Amino acid sequence: MNSAIRRQQSGAQAVILAGGLGTRMRPITETIPKPMIAVAGKPFLQRQLQLLTHSGIRRALLLVAYLGDQIQEYFGDGDKFGCSISYSFEPSPLGTGGALKNAEAQLQDYFVLVNGDTYLAIDYASLLQDFREADCTALIVAYGKPETASQSVPASVLPANLGVSQDGVVTAYHKRNSEGLNHIDAGVVVLKKEILARLPAGQKCSLEEEIYPQLIAQGELRAWVTSEPFYDMGSPTGLAALGEKLA
């Protein structure tokens, strides 16, 4: 990473969705929030922050809810982890869109949004640079095809959910119907803050179901294709696979 790009990234913001209930990981998550589950000796969220700081991203906003006080107590202001951390607490579960809307006042003009259970070791600096150069509203990380799916679960149970054209425009997003789709949402997307104007305040809503269809219809959602496997630690199988990778 050259010095100019590194300076740009030092002011970039990562937003991590860390408020989920972690129902697939019970009984572990009955007493600790899912992002605090240990992976190879460190809380998973710490692993995510290490990926981001390694790419020069040193500002993080954590969207927390369930047992969020434990997350704040552990990470504090982020200083001892090499970054600056702030928090947005959801009064009740608001979904991906609602959590962002709740944190609107704390968001920069654009930011990289990361699922709180996704481990994806990509070059986040390059992702952000490509977003700036593309001048698009949203740039979603799209992974391979179902036969080369995440190493954390068998390909047979991880269907494609994105349609991507040859010129990198997302043409479809379906969570339940993979027919004709050729890529997988890897759990990372760069967004312009301006999209939040499309969301209602104080209501539960989903980016995937309410915002992505609008962006796709207007040709505003582009894909950043990667061959780097991603890991979903939100299930016992995924957690075990990631633990083996990082051991």
Question: Predicted regions span which residues?
Answer:
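Conserved N-terminal catalytic core of the sugar/cofactor nucleotidyltransferase
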Residues: 2-16, 38, 42-119, 124-126
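Conserved adenylation A10 loop of the ANL superfamily
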Residues: 18-25
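Hydrophobic packing residues within well-ordered alpha-helices of enzyme cores
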Residues: 25, 71-75, 242
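Conserved catalytic-core motifs of eukaryotic protein kinase domains, centered on the activation segment
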Residues: 27-30
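Catalytic-core segments of class I nucleotidyltransferases/pyrophosphorylases
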Residues: 57, 111-112, 119, 125-132, ...
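Conserved beta-strand termini and adjacent loop/short-helix elements that scaffold enzyme active sites
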Residues: 65, 88-90, 141, 173, ...
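A short, conserved acidic/glycine-rich loop-to-beta-strand motif
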Residues: 134-144
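Short acidic-glycine loop/turn motifs at beta-strand connectors
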Residues: 163-168
